[in-house]
Design a protein with these regions (language model features):
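Short, flexible loop segments at boundaries between secondary-structure elements
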Residues: 194-227
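A polyanion-binding, active-site-adjacent surface
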Residues: 1-178, 186-193, 225
Length: 227
């Protein structure tokens, strides 16, 4: 896991935020926020050394990994404020989760629709969440320069290719894990790497229903990830 974590430090230049090594001065609760995000990602990964599935989406978003440090995972989930949906922080990792955003921004923590849909789908299917690693083709947070850190930007094709070394390190960490592509950007990266993977509809922008159906169909074939 050391090689994987080390590669995350090498984020590209431009309108890209690195949550594990950069501080968001206007929105982070403390100077130690990047270290907290690194610790939370490390805890998440350490509990998934035997994962059998990598669910690969597009890029980190400001409502998810920007503050949690974990792909497709929101602070609101980590803080236990999604229990009414059957989702709790113990699904993510066993330790005590911490917020890194200023409480005044979102008292309950930022929440990301895609994150809630993905974790909800795993919950509904009875999936052992330690068997699934959530990750992104472009592992950092691309934002719109005119709108700042609290915005999302679709990474360009060349940017997405920069995520290949990180993804290869992740695949080496959980060798044998099956990769599922969520959206066109992740499918394109996998194709460039010569990897054939099932392609799922991204749950954003009206795609939640199709994503749930496709995800359920694929995961039910791999029964060992189900409880």
């Amino acid at each position: 896991m050391h090689a994987f974590m080390k590669l995350l430090k090498n984020s590209p230049a431009g309108p890209v935020f690195n949550p594990w090594h950069d501080r968001d001065p206007g929105h982070d609760a403390s100077p130690g926020a990047p270290a907290v995000r690194r610790e939370q990602l490390a805890s998440y990964m350490a509990e998934r050394q035997k994962a059998t599935v990598i669910l690969l989406a597009e890029a980190l978003g400001y409502q998810g990994g920007h503050f949690s440090g974990i792909a497709m995972t929101s602070e609101r989930l980590l803080l236990g404020h999604l229990r009414h949906k059957g989702l709790g922080p113990e699904m993510v990792f066993a330790g005590q989760a911490r917020r890194t955003s200023l409480e005044d921004l979102r008292p309950g923590g930022f929440t990301e629709p895609t994150a809630t849909i993905v974790w909800g789908a795993m919950h509904e299917l009875g999936i052992d969440t330690r068997q699934v690693i959530l990750w992104n083709a472009f592992p950092w947070h691309p934002y719109k320069p005119d709108k700042g850190y609290l915005s999302n930007r679709t990474p360009g094709d060349e940017e997405v290719l920069l995520g290949e070394p990180v993804l290869r390190a992740l695949m080496a960490y959980v060798s044998g894990a099956r990769v599922l592509a969520v959206g066109q950007k992740s499918a394109a990266l996998l194709a460039a790497m010569g990897i054939t993977a099932p392609a799922l509809r991204h749950p954003a922008n009206g795609g939640a229903g199709m994503f749930r159906a496709q995800f359920a169909q694929i995961m039910k074939k791999g029964r060992k990830v189900l409880r």
